[in-house]
């Protein structure tokens, strides 16, 4: 089941979609401008409004830091353990103190209540 989203961070990183299955939660993102992108696995926070944290499993379409991929309008994915179907919102936050942090993403209070799950 997936829900379309349109959350943006600094007008550059766009959170397009969340998909939840029995085994994982998959977030689809892209950048609107040419950026050298990598995923800060260390200290990545994905949690729902109740404060439940869901551990990071893997990234797809982009490497873990420090290896950066130059991309624009190319989807990439962050995969976490399966979140509760009862969740009403979530935060996705990269650790600003992580070793390779440049402009760590912060998506807070992304609302799932308007979702039309398909």
Each model region followed by its residue ranges:
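Surface-exposed edge beta-strand/loop patches
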Residues: 1-10, 14, 23-25, 34-39, ...
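Catalytic phosphate/metal-binding cores of nucleic-acid and nucleotide-processing enzymes, i.e., regions
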Residues: 19
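Long, intrinsically disordered, low-complexity accessory segments associated with secretion
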Residues: 27-29
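An anionic, turn-rich surface loop/hairpin at beta-sheet edges
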Residues: 55-74
């Amino acid at each position: 089941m997936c829900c379309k989203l349109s959350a943006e961070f600094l007008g550059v990183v766009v959170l397009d979609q969340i998909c939840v299955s029995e085994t994982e939660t998959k977030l689809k993102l892209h950048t609107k401008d040419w950026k050298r992108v990598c995923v800060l696995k260390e200290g990545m926070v994905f949690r729902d409004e109740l404060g439940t944290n869901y551990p990071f499993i893997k990234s797809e379409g982009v490497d873990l830091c420090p290896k950066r991929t130059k991309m624009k309008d190319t989807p990439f994915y962050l995969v976490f353990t399966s979140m509760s179907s009862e969740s009403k919102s979530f935060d996705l936050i990269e650790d600003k103190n992580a070793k390779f942090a440049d402009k760590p993403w912060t998506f807070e209070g992304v609302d799932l209540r308007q979702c039309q799950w398909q």
